[in-house]
Amino acid sequence: MTNFERVKKFMETFGQEIKEKAEFPSDKIASLRHDLINEELDELKEAMNNKDIKEVADALTDILYVTYGAGHAFGINLDKCFKEVQNSNMSKLGLDGKPIYNEKGKVMKGPNYFKPNLDKFVV
């Protein structure tokens, strides 16, 4: 069972709306999902500012949890989307098979990069 599936079980148990196809939920649910993600991001910022690694772990896990919940609320299978994005990200290597970084250390797109095709999961 994936973490995305575990969150679905939680949502089913607690009577939360789950969409089976990609579509917007009600404004109330969309707003709730937005607020939950922002709340966890704020907790992450605070934990990082306090250099509290335990709270960083908690906030990062909660961000995943509420993001997976948002995926279910919008009917978007994040397991499938993640796999597609992972494949796209791995295409960023340079011609020599090595990563390309900018001055800040961000991985840049190599010449064989391809954009993830998420249409198949939301259309």
Where is each model-derived feature located?
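Flexible "arm" and connector segments at domain edges
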Residues: 1-123
